[in-house]
Amino acid sequence: MSTSSSDPFFNFAKSSFRSAAAQKASASSLPPLPGPDKKVPGMDIKYDVVIVGSGPIGCTYARELVGAGYKVAMFDIGEIDSGLKIGAHKKNTVEYQKNIDKFVNVIQGQLMSVSVPVNTLVVDTLSPTSWQASTFFVRNGSNPEQDPLRNLSGQAVTRVVGGMSTHWTCATPRFDREQRPLLVKDDADADDAEWDRLYTKAESYFQTGTDQFKESIRHNLVLNKLAEEYKGQRDFQQIPLAATRRSPTFVEWSSANTVFDLQNRPNTDAPEERFNLFPAVACERVVRNALNSEIESLHIHDLISGDRFEIKADVYVLTAGAVHNTQLLVNSGFGQLGRPNPTNPPELLPSLGSYITEQSLVFCQTVMSTELIDSVKSDMTIRGTPGELTYSVTYTPGASTNKHPDWWNEKVKNHMMQHQEDPLPIPFEDPEPQVTTLFQPSHPWHTQIHRDAFSYGAVQQSIDSRLIVDWRFFGRTEPKEENKLWFSDKITDAYNMPQPTFDFRFPAGRTSKEAEDMMTDMCVMSAKIGGFLPGSLPQFMEPGLVLHLGGTHRMGFDEKEDNCCVNTDSRVFGFKNLFLGGCGNIPTAYGANPTLTAMSLAIKSCEYIKQNFTPSPFTSEAQ
């Protein structure tokens, strides 16, 4: 928004109107919500760029385009609930970093299931005077069109400003050649170079590193043991993490806010930038022109006031996630509304919602072995009994016979002396393990050997969590046309949009075999660290629980030949000014976390926008 008094946005900023969400929010400098019935007389509400969605991908577009001088509006269906830093990671509190299991409840509270088959359980013990249904209920996300045998039952979305980045694991590995989509045809070296350039920039936005846990005893216990057991066969390292260690006991986890500060602009820190965030606003459809060559406007709905508005822009970017991008497009006349009909394919984006992928997931938890725990104090000289005056723990710094570095031994010595009541030699605030062996052709799955909070996997209070190691292995899924995400022409979701429905099964053949091999690999590897935790034996988890849904609006070079929706600049085929961002663009079978790859594609998309669209003039008169 301009700071010039001659700019109509300046006058509008001085008006008293705010969206209902903005009126009740405690965050400062929330924006006005433009609309034809609320605007200052004579003003024309138009942005250079509108972005739907405020997660890391939307924030990548915002960072690139706001910094390049574009006037940008961002709309999100969720509200601001992450504290002073809008869109920040909710794990960035001392409370959760001291007890990671408490964060499980935060994640569970944020996730909303996408498609839930109707519960056919009949309650036949109601009082005869109570109203009783003759059919099954359809509220709370229940979807009578969902086949429970072909569902992604664990698939869920997060509707808050910042999206899933407010509670994600921050794992940001790069895809290797086998997982990546091509950006450069017929030149593998040039494609490698292009991906390296984009990945490097994306990693800088996320502050990705591989050494935040280098002085964790538990991390090194697991890492060194696995490296020893698989010497010459597999490589182990820290999981690449979007995070910054602020102190030995506190990590700042990256989020959408790390990529782009979601405060409105201009402000004192960015006096020459133009950006507005509109929370609690549902984007319902984009309006196509008569030639189906560009988008003319975006229809939005203030979820608190109930008002509806039409927003105009030069460029429209949808980054609302793999499900909601597709939902918005279908509601706008792209793809096909209703159950797919192979004999009557849609004219616009016939591959929309087809060839979807989701990773298989195996999970278990182990309790570290006696051998590993005893090795923690192997350099200590222990005299006496804990609790007695004669008790002492010492070591010889720098001794060539030491098995551990001095920082390790100093922590162990101090803990054993200061907490003689504790049977474990591991300090209470020792950081968790964050280990991986990356996806490779001989073992085509991604691994996370760590201790973190998910919507599952909390540890009971009777087990000390310092002993626990979580094992999560993620398998790739081949894209198949029959695996689909489609949207009902009869039923709506809680936001009055077409109800999403899955038609999905893990394909037979390579996908299924690799999933079974992955399970075997996890069982063998985890047994080298310790025994299984009762209740967390090796198991396949619900389809969709990974929350890495991909391929819903696939990327490719040719719409028909590649069965895709967007080109390698993330621009929708046939449309000059409509762009899609997120994991829905990724058309390949991948096992690793896809966020960094989706961000890299967004950076490339922004480069195209900057080359082909000119920002509106900006004046710098004093406000």
Swiss-Prot record:
Molecular function in Gene Ontology: flavin adenine dinucleotide binding; pyranose oxidase activity
Record localization: Periplasm
Pfam families: GMC_oxred_C
Cofactor binding comment, as recorded: Binds 1 FAD covalently per subunit.
Function: Catalyzes the oxidation of various aldopyranoses and disaccharides on carbon-2 to the corresponding 2-keto sugars concomitant with the reduction of O(2) to H(2)O(2). Plays an important role in lignin degradation of wood rot fungi by supplying the essential cosubstrate H(2)O(2) for the ligninolytic peroxidases, lignin peroxidase and manganese-dependent peroxidase.
Subunit record text: Homotetramer.
Gene3D superfamilies per record: 3.30.1920.50, FAD/NAD(P)-binding domain
This protein's UniProt keywords: FAD, Flavoprotein, Oxidoreductase, Periplasm, Signal
Keyword Flavoprotein found: yes
Catalytic activity as recorded in UniProt: D-glucose + O2 = 2-dehydro-D-glucose + H2O2
Family: Belongs to the GMC oxidoreductase family.
Listed EC numbers: 1.1.3.10
Record lineage: Eukaryota, Fungi, Dikarya, Basidiomycota, Agaricomycotina
Organism field: Peniophora sp. (strain SG) (White-rot fungus)
Propeptide position ranges: 29-38
Signal sequence residues: 1-28
Modified sites of kind Tele-8alpha-FAD histidine: 167
PANTHER family, per database record: PYRANOSE 2-OXIDASE
Name of the protein in its database record: Pyranose 2-oxidase
